[in-house]
């Protein structure tokens, strides 16, 4: 187990949000439904309770064991890569413009 697992999980939620709530799309729901049974992490019941927690736990695995994720759940791996590719300077700026005052 990695010391910083919780932060990677929470960053997974943040990635999903900044990428356009990708964890709540019908496309990701299809990935979730087809691959959640293949999730083998110790937080299995928590991680597979809904698509948002599954995405966040999968980001944790993407960071800590990407080759395992890619081999065992290739659609999930591809969805995370797609989410990362949606992060643009414009999206980051929009989030900063909206939420910046709360973070100051």
Please tell me what each predicted stretch does.
Residues 1-104:
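Active-site-flanking segments in enzyme catalytic domains
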């Amino acid at each position: 187990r990695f010391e910083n697992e919780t932060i990677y999980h929470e960053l997974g939620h943040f990635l999903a949000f900044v990428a356009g709530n990708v964890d709540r799309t019908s496309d990701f729901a299809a990935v979730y439904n087809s691959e959640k049974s293949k999730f083998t992490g110790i937080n299995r019941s928590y991680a597979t309770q809904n698509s948002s927690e599954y995405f966040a736990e999968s980001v944790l695995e993407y960071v800590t064991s990407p080759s395992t994720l890619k081999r065992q759940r290739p659609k999930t791996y591809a969805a995370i890569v797609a989410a990362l590719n949606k992060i643009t300077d414009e999206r980051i700026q929009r989030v900063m413009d909206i939420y910046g005052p709360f973070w100051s």
